[in-house]
Amino acid sequence: MAQAQDFEVLRYDVTASLQPVANAVDVKATLSLVNQTTQGQSATDLILRLNKDAKVTALLLNGATTEFTQKEDPRLTGVSIVSAQLVKSVPPAGKLEAVLQYTLTVKESNQYSAITPGDCLLLPESYWIPVVHTPFTSHGADTAPYTLTVTLAGDGDILSEGERKGDGKTVMFTQTLNSQPWLMVGAPGKLVTRSITPAGATPITLTTISQVGSAGTEGQVQRILDEMEKIVGFYVQTLGPSPTNQFVVASNFREVTYISPGTILVGNAVFRRDRVEAETIEYLSRAVARTWIGGKLRVRGRGLGIVQDALPSFLSGLYFESRFGADAGQQFWARRVRSYAPLALARTDAMLMAQVPLDSDYFTSILNKGALVFRLIDWQFGKNTVVTAVKTILTGTTMDPLTVEGLRSTLIGPDKNANQPLQRFLKQWWDEIVEPDLIIGLPKKNETGTAWTCVLRNLGTGDVTVPVVAITGKGETLTTKAAIPSKGLGSVEFQTAEEVVRVEIDPDKLYPQTKFELDPNSSQFDNDSRPPRQYSFSLFLEANQLFEQKEFQKAEAKLLQTVAQEPGYASAQMLLARVELALGKSEATQSALQKALDVKPTPLYVTGWSAIVEGELALTRKDFKAAVEAYRRADGANAELACTLAAHKGLIESETQLQQISMPDESVKAYFSQLEKAVQSKTASVIEALVIKAELPKFVKGLALTKPDVWKTEVIRASQLDTQHVAVDVNLEALTTDLITGEKKDQKGSAVFILRKTQSGWVLARIDLFTVK
C-alpha cells in the first residue's frame, strides 16, 4: 500500500479565522506526518494538495521556513499542488511537522464550501485543509485525529465534531477519532440532549441541533432522538463498545448531508417533517456505523469503498430487519435492487475493488451492489458471517488500518486455499466483473407424477447458488436451492404431486442481475418467473409516465398489477392513491393512501405526496384548515420538486380561502421594493448590495447582462425558515433582452426567494422553485 516514500497524516492541528464579509478564511494548518514507506527509502520531498484558491504565504518544515511551489493540479479541478524539497531527508518511520499558512477565498459557494455572512461551510471535499492523499487514490482520504480552533468575525453558531470548548466568537473542537477537519456556521440552533446507556455499555449522550425556527418541531426532535437511541444501541450490541461517548445530529440551511465520526449533518427539512422517513433512517444508521468503521479504525487500501461505504450500507439493512421486521428488511433490499438496476442493465459497472469516489457511478454501485454482495455472503455462508468477522476486527488490536484484504482474510479464516468456497466467492464478486442474468424454464411433471422439474440457466457471468420457489394450485410454497455455473445450466426438482402453477428463480432478488424480466427487444426468453411477469419496479415507472401523461386509467391498471405482486411497495400504493384521486374515486384514494402509510418506515415519496393527497381531499370537503395543515407538511417534507410546487400552490389557495395567508413583515416588503429599483437601475454594484453574490453569481451576472427594463415582484406569502431566513412566494414579471437576437422577452411566473437577515438588513440568499418563463 505504501510507496517508496509516502507520508501518512498522524494528526491535524488547525486554526481558522473566518472573514465572512470578504468570503475568506485565514488558516494555519499543522500536519504531523510520518514516512510510512515499506520499501526502506527516505523521503526527500513533500507534496500536498490544497484548494487552488488558497494563497499560501508560508511553509514551515520542522519549524524552519522552507521554499515551496504552488501550481494547479492537472488532474483534479479546483486543486493545487504545494511541494517542497526537504532540507533533511526523513527516514522510514521518521516524522515531519509541516505548517502551512494561507488565505482561502470562496468566490462562489458550492455544496462543499461557502463563506458568507451568517452561513459558512468548509468540508474536506473542498480541500480547504492540505492533504497528502486524495480520496480517489488507493490510500483513501487522510483521516486522523484533529483539533480545530475557529474564530468568527460575524454572527452565527460554529459547529464541527468532537469535544467542544468555548462559546461565542472562538471555539475549539477536539476529535480523537479518525476524521478530517470541517466546520459549519449557521443560524443559532436549538440544542436538545438525551443520555442513554445501551445494555452493558457506558453512558452516551445524544444531541440534536436544529436550525428550524418553525413551531411544532419538538415532536420530530424526539422522534430523531428515539431513532438514534435505537440505532446506537443496535451497533453497540452488534459491533461492540461505542468509540465515542456522544452522537450529534445537526441540521443546516443548505440541506447538505455529511458523515463524520459521532456527528451527522442533515438538511433542515429532516426536522420539519412529521416523521423520520425511511431514507433518513437509512442515512442515520449508515452514518452511525461509520463511527466504528473509519472512525475507530482508519480505512485504507485498494477497494476501500467496499469497507468504507458498502459495509455500513449492509449493516444499515441489518438494522432495518432488527428494528422493523422482515418485511421492512425486504423493502430495504428491494430499494437497493431498484437503485442498482439501471446501472446493471447498462452493463457499465466496474469491479468493486477498482471503484473510487471519483467514478460517476461509485455510490450507485458501492451502496447498492456492494451491500447486496455482503447480504449474499450471509445468505450463502451462514447468518452473521459478516458481522462476526467485522466484530473480530473491531475488538482486536492487530488491524489498523482496516483494509479490504484484512476483511477478506478474516472472513475466509485459516483455510486460504484458492478453491475454498468463500475465497472463490469474494474473488468473483470483488475482484471481477460479474453480470449474472438468471432465467427459469417451464415446470415439467415427472413420469411418476410425484415431482416437478425446472431447467435453470445463467445467460450472464458468475457462478451462483440461488433459491427457487414453486407455487402449487392450493397456494403452497415450495423452496429449494440450485447451483448454476457462469453461462451454464442447472435444474431443480420440487417434490409434490400437486399442480405447480408458478415458479420463480431468486424471488427475493438476492443477486444483482442485469435483467429481472421479459425483454421485449430480445428473441431469447429472459424472465425470472413462469408464467412470465413484469418486474414491479418497471410497472411503477411505466405507471408514473402514464400518470404524467394524464393517462390515468392505464396508470391505474399498471399500479393495481404492481401492488398485487408487491403489496408492501409503498411508493406504488402512493402513486395509486394519486391516480385514484385524479379519477375522482375518493374511497379507492383513501384505501391506497392508507396502505401506503401502513408500510413502516414510510418512504420520503410517501411522506410528501400523502400530505398533498390529504390536502386535495380536504379542499374537496372545503375543510381549508385541514388543507393548510396538510400542505404545510408537504412543503416541509421537501420530498421532490413536483411535490413542493404542489404544496406551495395548495398553501396559497387554502390560506386565501381562510383569509389567513401568511404575509411577511414590512421590512421584507421594503426589501422587494429596493430590489425592483436596483434591478431597473441596471447597475451591478447596486444589485450586488442586495444579493449575496457568492451564493447567486449566475443570477447577478444574468441581471447585469440582460439589464431588464421591467422587474416587478408581487409578494404572495411568506414563511419563517429559521431565525435568519424567510421564504417568500412571489409572482414575477420581467422584460429582458435576448443576448443573441437582441429581442425583448416578456417573462412571467412564480418563484420562492429565500432572504437572509444580516447586520445590514435583508439580502437574497437563494432562489427556489423558479418557474419564470
Segments from the language model and where they lie:
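Amphipathic alpha-helical substructures
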Residues: 40, 243, 363-454
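Beta-strand-rich binding/interaction modules
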Residues: 57-60, 418-423, 435-439, 443-507
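Short solvent-exposed beta->alpha transition segments
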Residues: 405-409, 422-426, 655-729
